[in-house]
């Protein structure tokens, strides 16, 4: 796998019509792989490779005689089943609607009598949508290991971007 994205995507789209305007910013990466090794993330394998330290709903899909096609191996107190293999190579490509703003400029006839040159009302949202093939509890912007003093440093435990909504008024006198 290759943790360096082969392609980066950014698109800033905008349109306006009869006082209304909309702007949307998309960003993402394509062709990026991510190996979640034994010590790389507590969310995927459990902290320090111990599955019981962070049990979540996906960890319940482990091998048993009744579930031979499970995603995870049988939970054990060893790392033997969690060796490097393509089964656990994650697709870290994504596309995200990073920002969208919708606004309306009130007509001059309505606002000029109040000494206002321009009045714009808007609503904005950040991180409203994302599509990724990555494991569901990981944020593609916060993933990837890097070397720190010769050792791999965990970057999987960072908080993901928050979804934010804003409303406002711009007034020009």
Question: Which residues does each PLM region occupy?
Answer:
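Short sequence motifs at beta-strands and strand-loop junctions characteristic
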Residues: 3-6, 87-96, 159-162
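Repeated loop/turn-to-beta-strand initiation elements of outer-membrane beta-barrel proteins
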Residues: 19-24, 109-110
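Extracytoplasmic gating/loop element in the C-terminal half of outer-membrane beta-barrel translocons
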Residues: 29-120, 125-126
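C-terminal beta-signal and terminal closure region of outer-membrane beta-barrel proteins
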Residues: 50, 60, 65-67, 82, ...
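Outer-membrane beta-barrel pore domains and translocons
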Residues: 16, 27-29, 124-128, 172
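Membrane-embedded beta-strand positions in outer-membrane beta-barrel channels/transporters
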Residues: 10-12, 99-103, 166-168
């Amino acid at each position: 796998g290759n943790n360096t994205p082969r392609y980066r995507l950014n698109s800033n789209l905008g349109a306006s019509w009869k006082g209304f305007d909309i702007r949307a910013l998309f960003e993402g990466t394509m062709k990026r792989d991510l190996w979640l090794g034994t010590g790389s993330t507590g969310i995927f394998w459990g902290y320090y490779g111990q599955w019981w330290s962070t049990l979540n709903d996906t960890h319940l899909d482990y091998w048993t005689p009744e579930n031979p096609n499970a995603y995870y191996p049988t939970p054990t107190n060893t790392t033997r089943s969690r060796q490097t293999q393509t089964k656990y190579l994650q697709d870290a490509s994504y596309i995200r609607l990073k920002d969208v703003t919708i606004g309306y400029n009130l007509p001059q006839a309505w606002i000029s009598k109040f000494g206002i040159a321009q009045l714009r009302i808007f609503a904005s949202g950040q991180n409203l949508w994302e599509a990724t093939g990555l494991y569901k509890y990981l944020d593609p912007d916060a993933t990837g290991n890097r070397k720190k003093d010769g050792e791999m440093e965990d970057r999987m435990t960072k908080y993901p971007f928050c979804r934010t909504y804003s409303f406002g008024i711009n007034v020009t006198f």
